Amino acid sequence: MQESSTPLNQEVSSSRRNWLKNTALAGVAALAAPVIDASAKSAAPAPAARRIPLAVSTYSYWHFEEKKYPIEKVIEDAARLGFDGVEILHRQMTDESIPYMNKLKRLAFDNGLSLPMLSIHQSFVQPKAEDRKKDVAHTIRCINLAVQMGIPAIRMNTGSWRTVKRDAAYYKDGKEPAIQGYTDQDAIKWCIDSYGECLVAAEKAGVVLAIENHWGLSSNIDYLLEIYKPLSSSPAMGMNVDTGNFVGNPYPQFERLAPYATIVQAKTYYGGGFFYDLDLDYQKVADILRKANFKGYISLEMEGKENPATAVPKSLELFRKVFS
């Protein structure tokens, strides 16, 4: 007996016909498609290596002399020379007015330059809580300045006991005894607590606080990492590694810090250093940064006595050679 053709059977039959039709078309398309040789895939060009961006700090033109060198001129010079950005030293700013900060931001934008970091000073190595609070407030104020200028990072210090004179002997060993009645471990705790307060504001503002090996307590790399690591889970915590601020052989210490680096300040000393003189092997520095897969800014701090008009271009030429 022949079964009647039900709607379900008709639907199944139609589905089979469509499936067979689609399968046949797919087969034809597969036959018509070009054959790709496996060797052709492997021969595809590798992506071009990304060039590390180079900035110049306004500090390169002004080493705390009485008369400030205008930041506007640094921005214009940086654009002419071919830098990618300008790091602003807070103490070099004429004032903190909104019109002045907007002027710097617009000038950098018009010249195709970024402003990657605002370098500020503070010390949390102070026994009195009220003194540390003042520097926390100063840091938070500077976070707001960075936001106004569109700057994504702030250079941070730990501070120091200030129990020894900053002379040639100090820069050789970096040793500084604690104030009587206190220890370096006390200072480390003060730094962690103070940074924690600052990070609350930094996270809200979207500004990175980049702790630097900037003498004082941070001359000891173990201490620096002891402060950094408990705070590193914060999205606003970073590290600024300065090539010229190491005691003794810089390269093993630089290698320890390179994996944590958010930004790097690279010093040159043409004409002899203002405070001390180092002969840094920048090819070795570049190799360490490549090994650490560093991709951030390298900011020139020309700290030599030679005229910046000649020393800054020399430094840029050196950096282009080793970091490109």
Language model segments and positions:
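A cross-domain feature marking catalytic cores of carbohydrate-active enzymes
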Residues: 56-60, 88-92, 117-122, 156-158, ...
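Short amphipathic alpha-helices and their capping/turn segments at secondary-structure boundaries
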Residues: 44-46, 75, 100-110, 140-152, ...
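Charged helix-capping and loop-helix junction motifs
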Residues: 70-73, 100-103, 132-139, 192, ...
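Histidine-acidic metal/acid-base catalytic patches
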Residues: 2-34, 39-55, 62-81, 218-324
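N-terminal small/glycine-rich loop or linker at the start of catalytic domains
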Residues: 46-61, 117-123, 168-175
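Conserved, mostly hydrophobic/aromatic
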Residues: 56, 78, 86, 108, ...
